[in-house]
Design a protein with these regions (language model features):
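Hydrophobic membrane-embedded alpha-helices
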Residues: 2-11, 17-265
Length: 265
């Protein structure tokens, strides 16, 4: 019997909250100072879905790295190409001065290393947000593409070698990777320049990895009938989490030290 994926409707709500936070941050950067944290939710969702779908493909004996890469490429590149070309065309006509270095930046976008390109060119996200740079936000896609390249290799290692030896304890492989990412962010943080830890794939991977852990363990938690996430307890936890998220979106500032010393996790 083939295993199928049942879509979690809560993901749509989490995406909506994340998008709202990010959009409001870009429209009102001084009023919605912490809206950029919505990006963390997108990485978490990506990791969760990667784990759920990876596990289903594994159970159905249909997990193939080559097919995975082709599928992801076909999902990302057509829309990305159209968007980048449309933006370049628009700014060529109306704001050509904002396209200085566009060729190098476009190459970094299509090759999936725009986050590192922005880091190396000292393009601070929190400074550029008020300058309306057309491609500032694509650092996120760079991190996402790099994580999606590494993910099937990690998953194959997990299923082929770690899980057969450690059983249910194998999940600690991803937990420890997430912890290492959080520690890396804290260790590499410098108050005068947060670019390295904000844009770095290694220092942003923890959100994706937390999502992976949630995706791989969700079925086990459901089978155990975990009352923490059910009924009144679940609703109370949901509203408490929503209030905390809204508070963070309003109160947090992008260059506060505690964020990079475990706060984003």
């Amino acid at each position: 019997m083939r295993t199928t994926y049942t879509y979690n409707e809560g993901i749509n709500f989490l995406r909506a909250v994340s998008i709202l936070g990010i959009v409001l941050y870009h429209i009102f950067p001084f009023a919605m100072k912490g809206g950029f944290l919505g990006v963390c939710f997108f990485f978490l969702i990506s990791g969760y879905l990667a784990a759920k779908k990876g596990q289903i493909d594994w159970d159905n004996e249909s997990f193939h790295i080559r097919k995975y890469y082709i599928k992801k490429g076909l999902r990302i590149y057509p829309a990305l190409y159209i968007m980048v070309m449309a933006v370049i065309a628009f700014f060529t006509v109306f704001h050509q001065e904002l396209l200085l270095g566009a060729r190098e930046e476009a190459a970094s976008i299509f090759l999936g290393y725009n986050n590192w390109w922005q880091m190396l060119t000292q393009a601070s996200y929190f400074m550029k947000i008020t300058e309306h740079s057309p491609f500032t936000h694509l650092w996120y896609l760079g991190v996402e593409m790099e994580l999606l390249v590494v993910w099937p290799l990690l998953f194959l290692l997990y299923k082929k070698w770690i899980e057969p030896r450690l059983g249910k304890g194998a999940i600690w492989f991803f937990v420890l990777l997430a912890v290492a990412s959080v520690f890396a962010m804290g260790l590499m943080y410098h108050a005068d320049n947060v670019n390295r830890v904000y844009y770095g794939t290694d220092t942003r991977a923890f959100s994706f990895l937390i999502g992976v852990v949630l995706g791989l363990k969700e079925d086990d938690w459901n089978k155990k009938g975990n009352i923490l996430f059910q009924g009144d307890n679940g609703r109370a936890l949901f509203f408490a989490s929503l209030l905390v998220t809204i508070a963070l979106f309003v109160l947090v500032e992008g260059e506060q030290a505690w964020l990079y010393r475990g706060g984003m996790a």
